[in-house]
Swiss-Prot record:
InterPro entries: Ribosomal_uL6-like (IPR000702), Ribosomal_uL6-like_a/b-dom_sf (IPR036789), Ribosomal_uL6_a/b-dom (IPR020040), Ribosomal_uL6_bac-type (IPR019906), Ribosomal_uL6_CS (IPR002358). This is Large ribosomal subunit protein uL6c. NCBIfam families: L6_bact. Transmembrane segments: none annotated. Keywords: Chloroplast, Plastid, Ribonucleoprotein, Ribosomal protein, RNA-binding, rRNA-binding. The keyword RNA-binding applies. It is found in: Plastid, Chloroplast. Coiled coil: none annotated. The gene is rpl6.
Length: 181
């Protein structure tokens, strides 16, 4: 039995959830999200208590695996439309910087050319300083995926720590060569 799947999802005041078959619609102050649940996952909404419960219709490995996943994805949708998701990245290194050109993100990361990244339409990117980037949006997966794409342009290296890292990420440092003396 999934410990995560058994838990209910509490619905905030300004968020509405409705079902049409296996399709779940979540509306909130930040926007709207839709997801199709697997056919063997049953969703029930308790309106007076403002809670959502998920149940398995079958007992097999696939339904067991997708039971907790479906609950977490639904919970992430509720959080996304109520408060949104954001991920911060920091840039370390001499001459490394970021800037916005319209909705496009331009990264100068020590290559012979600036790296231009087109922001997906569902996300917003802000550059607070040339060394700080924030990716925000409604869907947690989309925010994390685009932040990972930005980080992959120049991941932090272990010797000097130069590159793009998530805020709060711990970079394991290595000692350099000692050389002959």
């Amino acid at each position: 039995m999934s410990r995560i799947g058994k838990q209910y999802i509490s619905i905030p005041d300004k968020v509405n959830i409705r079902l049409e078959g296996q399709k779940v619609f979540v509306d909130g102050p930040k926007g709207k999200l839709t997801r199709i649940l697997p056919s063997f996952i049953c969703c029930t909404i308790d309106e007076p208590e403002k809670k959502v419960f998920l149940e398995k219709a079958e007992e097999n490995k696939l339904s067991q695996a997708l039971y907790g996943l479906s609950r977490t994805l639904l919970s992430n949708m509720v959080t996304g439309v109520s408060s949104g998701w954001h991920k911060k990245l920091t840039i370390a290194g001499v001459g490394y910087r970021a800037q916005l050109d319209g909705k496009d993100l331009i990264l100068n990361m020590g290559y012979s050319h600036p790296v231009k990244m087109v922001t997906p339409p569902a996300l917003s990117v802000s550059v607070e300083s040339p060394t700080s980037i924030t990716v925000s949006g409604l869907e947690k997966e989309a925010v994390g995926e685009f932040a990972a794409k930005i980080r992959s342009v120049r991941p932090p290296e272990p010797y000097k720590g130069k590159g793009i890292a998530y805020e709060g990420e711990v970079i394991r440092r290595k000692a350099g060569k000692t050389g002959k003396k």
